[in-house]
C-alpha cells in the first residue's frame, strides 16, 4: 500500500540503488506512521493528508493554484482536525530525522571500515606532483594572480578519500611530505574545544526525545534481526514483533504532548545539555582518543599521540548571563555542583564494576609493596570499610582497595550534594577526594600494580582516560556578560564612593582607560564586603565572587573564562579586570590572574576595530604581563586553592595565550550573510597578525549558531575555509542547543562529528593554501561584501515598511510564546525593533515562513553588479574562486543549500494571508523586492557552481531537502490559517473564513505553536 507521502515507486527517482537500505527504512516508517494515524485519527485523516500532500510536487514549491486548493481544503477543517494534521506532519518529520540520522551513522561506520582498508597501502612517503593548469591560471589571472602555488589546491586534494577521518588524514600528510616534526609539534599543542549552549534550546521536549530514543533502539534491533535473516539465522517472527513494538511506541508518542508545558528553568537546560554526556560523550570521548592514536600509529608510528584531553568541552548552560536574568550566581554554583554530581555518579558506577571484575587473589598473583602500604593507610582512615569487608576480601587486595576508593567517592558525592542544596556539609572530616588528581593517583596505583604483575584491565584504563579528560567537573563553565553591565556597575559604585568628579559613564574612552589603568595598580579595595548597591550591580559583583568560590572549591579549571559580549573598546576589558581584582581573581602587583578575559566582537563595526582594540591592550604593560604569566615569570604561578586542580595542560592559564571570540549572529543580522562572513574572515587574519607581532598565541572562539544565518553549516568545511594561520592547532566553537540532538544523540555520529572537526583543525593548520593572502582576490571580496551589505541594509534598516512587514508576515510574536528557553526573546529594552530582537528568533521567524532571508539576501545583487562590469571574465573568475578558494566555496555552498530550502511561493502565501488589508499593497512591494533578489541569487549561484539545479553537487542532501520541502508546504498552509484566525481573534474581529466555527485564543495559539514545532522539525533547525 502506498504511503501518504511517497510510495517506493514515487521515490525511486530520488534514491539510487546504493541507498536501498535508506529507501527500505523510509518505507517501514511511512507505513508505521500511516498505521498510527489510521488507528488514532481514522481513514478520513489519512485521506486528507494524502490530498494535501498531493497538491505539491515531491520538490515542494507549491504553485498559486495549488495554494488555493490547499487553503480550500483547510477551510473545511475544524480546529481539532487542523491540529491533528499539523501534529501528523510534525511526527512524520521527526521520524524521517531519526531514519536519516540512523542511516548516516550506519554510513559512517561503513566508510570508516572501508577507509582503514583503503588507506593501508598509503603509508609510504610517495610524492604528489602538482596538477595545476598553469595556462588556465595565466589566462584567468593577468592581474598578477598567476603565482606558482595557485594550482596546488591542497585543501581539496584527497577529499574523496578523506571524509574527515584520522584514518585518511595521516596517510594524506605522509603523501604530501609534511615534515613529521611539524606534525608532532601541532599534535602536542592540539586543543579542540566545543562549548555547549542552551539557546536556542532544542524545541523538542525531553519526553519526546525519550520516545525517539526508544524508536532508534527498536530500529537497531530490527537491523540485527534482518541481518541474521539474510544469513539464514534468526526466527521469522522476530522482525514482525519488533515492528509491533515500533507501532506501540509511535502510538504512545502520538498521545504525548509535543509542547513544553512550562518555561524551562536554567537547571532544566543544564540537565538537558548534560544528557549527551551521560548517554554518549562520557564513554565516547575516550574512544575518540583511541581512534586518533591508532590512526597516527598506522602512518607515523614514532610520533607521540596528543594529550587525552585534546578534545574537551565547555558549557554556557548555567553560566551565560548575557540577557538572561534567570542565570544568577547561585544558579552558576548549582550548575557546577550538578555537573560534579553526574560525573561522580559515573565514577562510582565504574568503580563498582571494577570491584566485580578485579577478583585477583594473593594466592595466585603477586602484590607490590606500594599497594599494601596504601591499604594500611586506608585502614587507618576508613576503619568502617575495613571492619565490614576485610574478612570478605582478605585475599583480594584489589577489591579491598577499590572498596576504599568507592567510599571516598561516595563521601565526595555526599559533600557535593550538600553544597548543591546550599547546606553546610556534615562530613567534612570524612576521608574524601578533594580533586580528581587524588582519585586519578589511586587508579594509577592499581594500574601500575596490574602492569608490573603482567596483567591489564581495559575497564580500568578507560576509567583513567575518563578522569584525565573530565576530571571531577565534566565541563568548563564560561561566564558571559554584556559589556554595559560592567560599566553601569562601576558607574554606580564610583558614584556611591564619590571617587570621580563626574559620572564614570560620562568619561571619554581615553579617560576611562587612564583611570582604570591607575586603579588596577591600586592595592586598596574598591568594593566592601557589604553591597549597598542596586540588584543589577550586586549581581555583577556576586558573579565575580562566585567565580572565586568555584575556583576554590572545584579548582581553577572549572571556570577560568570570562567573555564580554558586545565588546567595543579597551575599557570594556579593563573594567572586567578591575572587577576581577576586587574578587581576588587578579593580583595587579605581580600581574597574575586565574581568569582569562575574552572580548567578544559581534557587530561589523566591532569586528573592524577588533585589531585596534587588541593592539592597545597588548601595549599596556599590565595586560601584557598578565598574558605572560606575571612580571617575573613566563609561567603562571597562582596560590593553590583549597582543592588542587587536576594537573592537565589547561589547569591554569596558558602563558601568552589570548582568546578572542567572534560572533556570527549579530554581524549577520547587522550586515547580511556575505558581509558578515567576510568581516569575520578579515578579523581573524588581522587578529593573528597583531598577535604574532606581540608574541602572543591566539585562540579564536567561533560563536556559530545552528542555522546558516548564524554561522551554522558543516563544521569540517567551515574550518578548512578559515585563514590557516588563525588556527595553529587551536579552535573553540559553540555547539548550539538546537543541534545537540543531531550531532550527539548517537555514539558513532558524535565520534564522527568530533573527528571531522579535529582533522579539519589539523589539516587547516598544516596544509595552508595561501589563497587568503592574494590581495587582488581580497579586493574583489571586499567589493562584493560592501555591495551585499548595502543592499541588505537597504531592505532591513532603510525600507520604512520592513519592520511592520516582518511582524505581520512572520510568526515572531507566536515564537516568543514557545516555552523552549529560559532566555527572553528580546533584549531588556523591550522595543519592537531589530536592535532589541535577538538573532535567534530573527532567524527562526524567517525559517518558519520559508524566506530564510538572513542567509542569502544581498548576495545576488553583489554578484550581479560585479558581473555587469565584465560578464564573461568575472563569471570565469567566480567559478575559479569556487573551485580553488575554500572560503569562497564555503560561502557559495552555504547560500546554495539555503536557497534550496527557500519556497518563495509559500513565502508569498504568508504575505497575502497575514498582511492587514490596509498594509497589503505596501507589503507586496517589499515581498516583490525580496522575491526578485531570491531569483537573481539563485540564478547566479547556479551559474557559478555550473549546476542545473540547486545542490546537484550533493545529491544526498538534495534528496533530503526535496523529501522535506514537499511536506512542509501543506504544514505551512495550516500554520498560515491558524495564525490568521488567531490574530483576528486577538483583534476582536473574528470572521468566518479560515477555520469554521469559533475557538478560544488558547486553542488557536496551541495549534499555531504545534505547526511551529512541525516546521522546525522539517527544516531541522530553529534559529
Curated annotation (Swiss-Prot):
It catalyses: oxaloacetate + phosphate = phosphoenolpyruvate + hydrogencarbonate. The active site is at 199, 669. GO terms for biological process: carbon fixation; oxaloacetate metabolic process; tricarboxylic acid cycle. InterPro entries: PEP_COase, PEP_COase_bac/pln-type, PEP_COase_Lys_AS, PEPCASE_His_AS, Pyrv/PenolPyrv_kinase-like_dom. It is an enzyme of class 4 (lyase). Keywords: Carbon dioxide fixation, Lyase, Magnesium. This is Phosphoenolpyruvate carboxylase. Gene3D superfamilies: Phosphoenolpyruvate/pyruvate domain. Belongs to the PEPCase type 1 family. The lineage of its organism: Bacteria, Bacillati, Cyanobacteriota, Cyanophyceae, Nostocales. Its EC number is 4.1.1.31. The keyword Lyase applies. It comes from Trichormus variabilis (strain ATCC 29413 / PCC 7937). PANTHER family: PHOSPHOENOLPYRUVATE CARBOXYLASE. GO terms for cellular component: cytosol.
Amino acid at each position: 500500500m502506498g504511503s501518504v507521502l511517497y510510495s517506493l515507486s514515487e521515490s525511486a527517482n530520488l534514491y539510487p540503488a546504493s541507498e536501498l537500505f535508506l529507501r527500505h527504512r523510509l518505507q517501514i516508517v511511512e507505513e508505521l506512521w500511516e498505521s498510527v494515524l489510521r488507528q488514532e485519527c481514522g481513514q478520513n485523516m489519512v485521506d486528507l493528508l494524502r490530498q494535501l500532500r498531493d497538491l505539491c510536487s515531491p520538490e515542494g514549491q507549491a504553485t498559486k493554484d495549488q495554494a488555493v486548493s490547499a487553503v480550500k481544503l483547510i477551510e473545511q477543517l475544524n480546529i481539532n482536525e487542523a491540529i491533528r494534521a499539523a501534529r501528523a506532519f510534525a511526527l512524520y518529520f521527526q521520524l524521517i530525522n531519526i531514519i536519516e540520522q540512523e542511516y548516516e551513522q550506519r554510513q559512517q561506520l561503513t566508510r570508516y571500515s572501508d577507509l582503514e582498508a583503503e588507506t593501508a597501502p598509503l603509508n609510504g612517503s610517495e610524492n604528489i606532483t602538482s596538477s595545476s593548469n598553469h595556462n588556465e591560471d595565466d589566462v584567468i589571472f593577468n592581474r598578477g594572480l598567476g603565482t606558482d602555488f595557485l594550482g596546488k589546491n591542497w585543501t581539496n586534494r584527497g577529499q574523496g578519500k578523506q571524509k574527515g577521518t584520522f584514518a585518511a588524514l595521516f596517510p594524506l600528510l605522509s603523501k604530501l611530505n609534511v615534515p613529521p616534526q611539524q606534525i608532532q609539534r601541532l599534535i602536542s599543542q592540539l586543543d579542540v574545544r566545543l562549548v555547549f549552549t542552551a539557546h536556542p534550546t532544542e524545541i523538542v521536549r525531553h519526553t519526546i526525545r525519550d520516545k525517539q530514543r526508544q524508536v532508534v533502539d527498536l530500529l537497531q534491533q530490527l537491523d540485527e534481526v534482518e541481518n541474521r535473516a539474510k544469513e539464514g539465522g534468526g526466527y521469522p517472527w522476530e522482525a514482525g514483533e519488533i515492528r509491533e513494538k515500533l507501532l506501540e511506541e509511535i502510538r504512545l508518542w502520538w498521545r504525548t504532548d509535543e509542547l513544553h508545558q512550562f518555561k524551562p528553568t536554567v537547571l532544566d537546560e543544564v540537565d538537558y545539555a548534560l544528557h549527551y554526556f551521560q548517554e554518549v560523550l562520557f564513554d565516547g570521548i575516550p574512544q575518540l582518543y583511541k581512534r586518533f592514536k591508532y590512526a597516527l600509529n598506522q602512518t607515523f608510528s614514532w610520533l607521540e599521540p596528543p594529550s587525552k584531553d585534546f578534545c574537551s568541552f565547555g558549557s554556557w548552560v548555567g553560566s551565560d548571563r548575557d540577557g538572561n536574568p534567570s542565570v544568577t550566581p547561585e544558579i552558576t554554583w548549582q550548575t557546577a555542583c550538578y555537573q560534579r554530581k553526574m560525573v561522580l555518579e559515573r565514577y562510582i558506577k565504574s568503580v563498582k564494576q571494577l570491584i566485580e571484575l578485579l577478583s585477583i587473589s594473593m594466592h595466585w598473583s603477586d602484590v607490590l609493596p606500594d599497594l599494601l602500604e596504601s591499604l594500611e593507610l586506608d585502614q587507618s582512615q576508613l576503619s568502617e570499610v575495613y571492619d565490614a569487608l576485610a574478612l570478605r576480601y582478605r585475599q583480594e587486595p584489589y577489591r579491598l582497595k577499590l572498596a576504599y576508593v568507592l567510599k571516598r567517592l561516595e563521601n565526595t558525592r555526599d559533600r557535593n550534594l550538600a553544597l548543591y542544596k546550599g547546606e553546610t556539609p556534615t562530613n567534612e572530616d570524612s576521608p574524601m577526594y578533594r580533586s580528581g588528581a587524588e582519585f586519578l593517583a589511586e587508579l594509577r596505583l592499581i594500574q601500575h600494580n596490574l602492569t608490573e604483575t603482567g596483567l591489564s584491565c581495559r575497564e580500568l584504563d578507560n576509567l583513567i582516560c575518563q578522569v584525565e579528560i573530565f576530571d571531577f567537573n565534566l565541563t568548563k563553565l564560561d561566564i558571559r556578560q554584556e559589556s554595559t553591565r560592567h560599566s553601569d556597575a562601576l558607574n554606580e559604585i564610583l558614584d556611591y564612593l564619590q571617587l570621580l568628579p563626574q559620572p564614570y559613564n560620562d568619561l571619554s574612552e581615553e579617560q576611562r582607560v587612564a583611570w582604570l589603568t591607575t586603579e588596577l595598580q591600586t592595592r586598596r579595595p574598591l568594593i566592601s564586603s557589604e553591597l549597598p548597591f542596586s540588584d543589577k550591580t550586586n549581581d555583577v559583583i556576586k558573579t565575580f565572587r562566585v567565580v572565586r568560590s568555584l575556583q576554590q572549591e572545584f579548582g581553577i579549571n572549572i571556570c577560568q573564562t570570562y567573555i564580554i559580549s558586545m565588546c567595543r573598546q579597551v575599557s570594556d576589558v579593563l573594567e572586567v579586570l578591575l572587577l576581577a581584582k576586587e574578587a581576588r581573581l587578579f593580583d595587579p602587583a605581580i600581574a597574575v590572574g586565574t581568569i582569562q578575559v575574552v572580548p567578544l566582537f559581534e557587530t561589523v563595526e566591532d569586528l573592524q576595530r577588533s585589531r585596534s582594540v587588541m593592539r592597545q591592550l597588548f601595549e599596556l604593560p599590565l595586560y601584557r604581563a598578565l598574558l605572560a604569566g606575571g612580571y617575573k615569570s613566563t609561567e603562571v604561578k597562582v596560590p593553590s586553592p583549597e582543592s588542587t586542580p587536576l594537573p592537565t595542560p589547561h589547569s591554569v592559564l596558558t602563558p601568552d595565550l589570548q582568546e578572542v571570540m567572534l560572533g556570527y549572529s549579530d554581524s549577520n543580522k547587522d550586515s547580511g550573510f556575505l558581509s558578515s562572513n567576510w568581516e569575520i574572515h578579515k578579523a581573524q587574519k588581522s587578529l593573528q597578525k597583531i598577535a604574532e607581532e606581540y608574541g602572543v598565541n591566539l585562540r579564536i572562539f567561533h560563536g556559530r549558531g545552528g542555522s546558516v544565518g548564524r554561522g551554522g553549516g558543516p563544521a569540517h568545511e567551515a574550518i578548512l575555509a578559515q585563514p590557516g594561520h588563525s588556527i595553529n592547532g587551536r579552535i573553540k566553537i559553540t555547539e548550539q542547543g538546537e543541534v545537540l540532538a543531531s550531532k550527539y544523540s548517537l555514539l558513532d555520529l558524535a565520534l564522527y562529528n568530533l573527528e571531522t572537526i579535529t582533522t579539519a583543525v589539523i589539516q587547516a593548520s598544516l596544509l595552508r593554501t595561501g589563497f587568503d593572502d592574494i590581495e587582488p582576490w581580497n579586493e574583489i571580496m571586499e567589493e562584493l561584501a560592501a555591495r551585499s551589505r548595502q543592499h541588505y541594509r537597504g531592505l532591513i534598516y532603510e525600507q520604512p515598511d520592513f519592520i511592520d512587514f516582518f511582524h505581520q508576515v512572520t510568526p515572531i510574536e507566536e515564537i516568543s510564546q514557545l516555552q523552549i528557553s529560559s532566555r527572553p526573546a528580546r533584549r531588556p529594552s523591550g522595543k519592537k525593533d531589530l536592535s532589541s530582537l535577538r538573532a535567534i528568533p530573527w532567524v527562526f521567524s524567517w525559517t518558519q515562513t520559508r524566506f530564510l532571508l538572513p542567509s542569502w539576501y544581498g548576495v545576488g545583487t553583489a554578484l550581479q553588479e560585479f558581473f555587469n562590469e565584465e560578464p564573461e571574465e568575472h563569471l570565469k573568475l567566480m567559478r575559479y574562486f569556487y573551485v580553488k578558494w575554500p572560503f569562497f566555496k564555503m560561502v557559495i555552498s552555504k547560500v546554495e543549500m539555503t536557497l534550496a530550502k527557500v519556497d518563495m511561493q509559500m513565502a508569498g502565501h504568508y504575505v497575502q494571508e497575514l498582511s492587514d488589508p490596509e498594509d497589503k499593497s505596501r507589503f507586496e512591494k517589499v515581498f516583490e523586492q525580496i522575491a526578485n533578489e531570491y531569483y537573481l541569487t539563485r540564478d547566479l549561484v547556479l551559474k557559478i557552481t555550473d549546476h542545473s539545479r540547486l545542490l546537484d553537487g550533493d545529491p544526498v542532501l538534495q534528496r533530503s531537502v526535496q523529501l522535506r520541502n514537499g511536506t512542509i508546504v501543506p504544514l505551512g498552509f495550516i500554520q498560515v490559517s491558524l495564525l490568521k484566525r488567531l490574530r483576528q481573534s486577538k483583534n476582536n474581529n473574528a470572521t468566518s473564513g479560515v477555520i469554521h466555527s469559533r475557538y478560544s485564543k488558547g486553542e488557536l495559539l496551541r495549534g499555531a505553536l504545534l505547526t511551529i514545532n512541525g516546521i522546525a522539525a522539517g527544516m531541522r533547525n530553529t534559529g
